[in-house]
Amino acid sequence: MLDINFIESNLVKVKEQLNKRSGDYSLIIDEAVELNVQRKSILKEVENLKANKNNLSKQVGELMRNKQSDEANKIKEEVTLINSKIEKLDDSLKLVQEQLTSKLQNIPNIPNDNMPIGNDDNDNVEVRQWGNELIKKHNTPHWDIADKLKLVDFEAGPKLSGSRFVVYTGLGAKLVRSLSNILLNLHTSKGYTEITVPLLVNPQAMYGTGQLPKFKEDAYITTNDQYLIPTGEVPLTNLHAGEILDLNQLPIHYTTYSQCFRQEAGSAGRDTKGLIRLHQFNKVELVKITNQESSEAELQAMVNDAEAVLQLFNLPYRVVELCTGDVGFSSSKTYDLEVWFPEQNKYREISSCSNCTDFQARNMQTRYRDANGEVKLAHTLNGSGVAIDRLIAAILENYWDGEKLILPTALKPYFDNKEYID
């Protein structure tokens, strides 16, 4: 969340920046500021009452020493009344603080000053392209290829679990395992530490990264108030919640392979076939925790690390900088990697890399001590490195020759050095 004191001190600028997103945040900002005024007023009143109580308590002690018990008892009655007032004010303070926190949890991060301004993905800006968009004689959708090669059972998933679930079979299951291994090896070779994370997290972890309360309807919650992770970002980023890190520990680079779970609320009718939009999917995640000065450079490096995956498989892609209206709730700046799908004749997102600045760190209280000994909020970054189901879909469409699937060079060692699957 944002710092309410920063909001108050930069009210016009904050409103101006946030309203560049697809929405008007002026009202909720004003409500948060008003609640903070109330909070500070209550705190001041409590402080004055406690000061008065301390003075009266000293008088009671003096009177008792002088054996003026009647006067002392009168003052004790005043102290009792003050205690009652403080108790009521504490209750009011708790309520106001809860209301303020609720408002702040629904205010997104401030977009970076240098981001393109726009309303939606139509206003995103292409930064660069890599590779050649393939124009093929045999443009076949990836789900037909997967079905023909018996890589995915698209009927078993719905039979077992409902729509938007799939079952990888035989070489398809081997493909998932092989790709996760290749991606983790690639990222660990670049200095990321591999982590295996729980698939269930507590609500505090979801609040920490900003999934709650904004995206509650998109999450799977269990009967004991735990959440299935929507992304490996949640457990990885929360590993250092509540900690003060030494400067020499930064930057921290983590990677994990996990299954992820999303309700895909609001996606009815979109990508109903294939592997693009699933309730349960496979992903390799990248997370960085940095000092405040280096996060922008670390974001660019993270984008390059995600690009390395697509280059390894020689898949055409483009890098797109998201506009203010399309950037995610917790992000200050985001780049999407979009891979080429010949059958659809367009690029589709396969990775999203974001700098969340201190937005998540404030929720989690992830801090570090700088060179001068000052404690500061860390910056957090996250990115897909990459979404494996979408990577499989892209490989199928780009490497299908009409009769068989030509295996990319990086995959051949995992398939007994075969040239293709048919």
Swiss-Prot record:
Binding positions (L-serine): T231, G232, E233, E285, S384
UniProt keyword list: Aminoacyl-tRNA synthetase, ATP-binding, Cytoplasm, Ligase, Nucleotide-binding, Protein biosynthesis
GO molecular function (one): ATP binding
The protein, known as: Serine--tRNA ligase
Biochemical pathway: Aminoacyl-tRNA biosynthesis; selenocysteinyl-tRNA(Sec) biosynthesis; L-seryl-tRNA(Sec) from L-serine and tRNA(Sec): step 1/1
Record has Protein biosynthesis as a keyword: yes
Any matching Pfam family: tRNA-synt_2b
Location within or outside the cell: Cytoplasm
UniProt entry tagged with the keyword Protein biosynthesis: yes
Family stated for the protein in its record: Belongs to the class-II aminoacyl-tRNA synthetase family. Type-1 seryl-tRNA synthetase subfamily.
GO cellular component, one term: cytoplasm
